[in-house]
């Protein structure tokens, strides 16, 4: 079980990323636009730098949805590998069977 403060911080980051996503995308488009002037690119770069640090989606952490474990998360299921194995053995995941060959 992860610390509740770490889970809460990550949830707050999700909100901030969502809030600034449109503005961030607009600034990024200006940066890579070949028709943009140098002044526009410079303004876009400064605008990106002025955004909050937590507005970047790279700062989000994929966590287990059940207990918040930060590592070994299976994206398809949203749970950690440990929890996945445990739930699969108990038959709580429909369609998942232990492989055998």
Curated annotation (Swiss-Prot):
Keywords of the record: Ribonucleoprotein, Ribosomal protein, RNA-binding, rRNA-binding
Subunit structure, as described in the record: Part of the 30S ribosomal subunit. Contacts proteins S3 and S10.
Pfam families in the record: Ribosomal_S14
One of the record's GO cellular component terms: small ribosomal subunit
MF (Gene Ontology): rRNA binding; structural constituent of ribosome
Any GO BP: translation
UniProt similarity note: Belongs to the universal ribosomal protein uS14 family.
Function noted in UniProt: Binds 16S rRNA, required for the assembly of 30S particles and may also be responsible for determining the conformation of the 16S rRNA at the A site.
Organism taxonomic ancestry: Bacteria, Bacillati, Actinomycetota, Actinomycetes, Micrococcales
InterPro entries linked to this entry: Ribosomal_uS14, Ribosomal_uS14_bac/plastid
Species this protein is from: Paenarthrobacter aurescens (strain TC1)
Name recorded for this polypeptide: Small ribosomal subunit protein uS14
